[in-house]
């Protein structure tokens, strides 16, 4: 399977360059989310608190602020625009026709924005995912949709729908707890989060993993657990980034083959389907 980032693009993408030059309210401007009022969507949290002061950034060419849930060079697409939704379908069709077996759907909780909400996990997002799944099922055989929703299990389970949204969903909270359990020599961190994990449709499955291309995220742990993870896995202050640890698998485990094998044995023995990020298979 391959990565499909549908929430945002680069600010260098031709869509954004075209949008910032287009008149307000025009077809191409509406590929992105713009405002002249930075109080709009004020209840949405800032995800990268260490680098981004706001979810809005001023664009001098457009003479307006654009919305971004992540870095300011990653403007969010406007999923209220049917043309944007169709662009996503076209992109997926292209890659499916080339033989891709599935897609990791990046940052799916943030596709839509509504005033008076935190702009996460909105009903409109699930309506769109059902449309996307129906499109894939109607036009392609045996394709997989994997949701990236860095949430607690009871929240991320919503991205399975009734078996009509994503086939799989990352289980983010279990990942740091595997590292925690091995260091503590105690199964409790793992068992505790498994006990908090709801039942899901029979046709769906959790994806479990040790590392990916992002930092080892510590969003889905308690403050006490986060402090413990920083203490034992990121003694170098430069390893801390945002709410996580930027180290690869082998350095996290002291480049010790036995520890690496132990973590992989644990990964393959837990409920769920193991997911291996390509560049981390052997390191």
Regions found by a protein language model. Name each.
Residues 1-281:
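Active-site and adjacent substrate-binding regions of carbohydrate-active enzymes
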């Amino acid at each position: 399977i391959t990565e499909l980032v549908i929430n945002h693009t680069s600010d260098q993408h031709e869509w954004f360059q075209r949008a910032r030059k287009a008149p307000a309210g025009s077809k191409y401007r509406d590929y992105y989310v713009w405002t002249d009022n930075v109080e709009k969507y004020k209840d949405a949290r800032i995800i990268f608190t260490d680098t981004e002061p706001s979810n809005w950034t001023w664009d001098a060419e457009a003479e307006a602020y654009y919305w971004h849930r992540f870095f300011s060079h990653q403007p969010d697409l406007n999923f209220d625009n049917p043309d944007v939704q169709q662009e996503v379908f076209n992109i997926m069709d292209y890659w499916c026709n080339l033989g891709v077996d599935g897609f990791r759907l990046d940052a799916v909780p943030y596709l839509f924005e509504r005033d008076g909400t935190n702009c996460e996990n909105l009903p409109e997002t699930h309506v769109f995912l059902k449309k996307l799944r129906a499109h894939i099922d109607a036009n392609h055989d045996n394709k997989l949709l994997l949701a990236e929703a860095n949430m607690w299990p009871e929240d991320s389970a919503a991205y399975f729908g009734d078996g009509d949204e994503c086939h799989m969903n990352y289980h983010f909270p279990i990942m740091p707890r595997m590292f925690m359990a091995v260091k503590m020599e105690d199964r409790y961190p793992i068992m505790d989060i498994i006990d908090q994990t709801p039942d899901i449709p029979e046709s769906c499955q959790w994806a479990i993993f040790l590392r990916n291309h992002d930092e080892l995220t510590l969003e889905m742990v308690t403050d006490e657990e986060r402090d413990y993870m920083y203490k034992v896995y990121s003694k170098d202050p430069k390893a801390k980034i945002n709410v996580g640890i930027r180290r690869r698998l082998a350095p996290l485990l002291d480049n010790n083959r036995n520890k690496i094998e132990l973590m992989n044995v644990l990964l393959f023995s837990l409920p769920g389907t193991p997911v291996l990020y390509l560049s981390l298979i052997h390191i």
